UniProtKB/Swiss-Prot annotation:
SUPFAM superfamilies: Metallo-hydrolase/oxidoreductase. One of its GO terms (cellular component) is mitochondrial matrix. GO terms for molecular function: metal ion binding; RNA endonuclease activity; single-stranded RNA binding. It comes from Caenorhabditis elegans. This is Beta-lactamase-like protein 2 homolog. It comes from the Eukaryota. Belongs to the metallo-beta-lactamase superfamily. Glyoxalase II family. Zn(2+) 2 binds at residues 83-84, 160, 195. Zn(2+) 1 binds at residues 79, 81, 141, 160.
Length: 295
């Protein structure tokens, strides 16, 4: 793993926001999952719950609650991945003494248990003293992804849509790019990400994410325009021509996701099971490039 910015296990980031690290570092979780306790009073909102059975995390969460003489009133989940929902049972058993409290989450087609969550939609709000959260649908990383707008600070909890460092993975690139633009348009003062350090240069970070994805998209479009029809594997071989075979195999899924997005944009057809054809027009990536060239 490349060198990562140090993230404190427990850190008070503002009057209303305390970050508790999930104690689960790894290639995909970076320093670990960031969970957050929100509020200035005795009632707190917990954003995400870390992985299951991580004793160090539960101990850290207990210590913050004890030191602030507070308790968890609500839990809000950004998305279904195990490093964000996995700690729910441990928290329920070891901190809430099996008391059931609202756990808010967006519903997805393949969900983990209907009775566990209170399913809510885009625009839902939950509040405690000093912290009013508006839930904003930002699909792409996953279909059920919420980002959370903290009204008092004009700050955003981005879940895994944007990370404190590095880039994230996604299920649907078309939806993901739309969500990135939605986040940019919010003009947040800062971003509290699901992994990594706090982001204060918000527009710069979001633009970096958008350009990273559009650069690869433009490379794929160039290859498509050079062929009548072409398979996703052949696109991958040309775009990643200088990469080892193992890297190309790993990149194939990302290429397929870009092709899926271009089909949604209406500039590519999928006439046969594994072949794709450029039919013309401008993709979102090309439009953005043209805007930049006119500045």
């Amino acid at each position: 793993m490349p060198s990562l910015t140090h993230v404190e296990p427990i850190e008070k980031l503002s009057d209303a926001v305390t970050r508790i690290l999930g104690h689960n570092p790894g290639p995909f979780t970076l320093q670990g999952t960031n969970t957050y306790l929100l509020g200035t009073g005795a009632k707190k909102i917990l954003v995400d719950t870390g992985e299951p059975n991580v004793t160090e995390y539960i101990s850290a969460l207990k210590s913050v609650l004890a030191s602030t003489n507070s308790h968890i009133e609500y839990i809000v989940i950004t998305h279904w991945h195990g490093d964000h929902v996995g700690g729910i049972d441990n928290i329920t058993d070891e901190i809430l003494d099996k008391k059931k409290i609202p756990i808010y989450k967006m519903k997805r087609d393949k969900d983990e248990g209907v009775e566990r969550f209170h399913y809510v939609d885009d625009g839902f709000e939950v509040a405690v003293d000093g912290a009013t959260l508006k839930l904003i649908a930002t699909p792409g990383h996953t279909a059920d992804h919420f980002s959370l707008w903290l009204q008092e600070e004009r700050a955003l909890f981005s879940g895994d849509c944007i990370l404190g460092e590095g880039t994230t993975v996604f299920e649907d690139l078309h939806d993901y790019m739309t969500s990135l633009q939605k986040i940019k348009d919010l003009n947040a003062t800062r971003i509290y990400p699901g992994h990594g350090p706090v982001i204060d240069k918000v527009v710069e970070k979001v633009d970096e994410y958008i350009e990273h994805r559009m650069k690869r998209e433009r490379e794929i479009i160039k290859v498509l325009k050079e062929h009548e029809e072409i398979t996703s594997m052949d696109v991958t071989n040309q775009v990643y021509a200088d990469s080892p075979w193992a890297v190309r195999l790993a990149a194939l899924n990302n290429v397929k996701l870009v092709l899926k997005k271009l089909c949604k944009d209406g500039v590519v057809e999928n006439p046969h099971f594994e072949t794709f054809k450029w039919i013309g027009g401008s993709s979102s990536g090309e439009e953005k490039k043209n805007e930049s060239s006119n500045l």
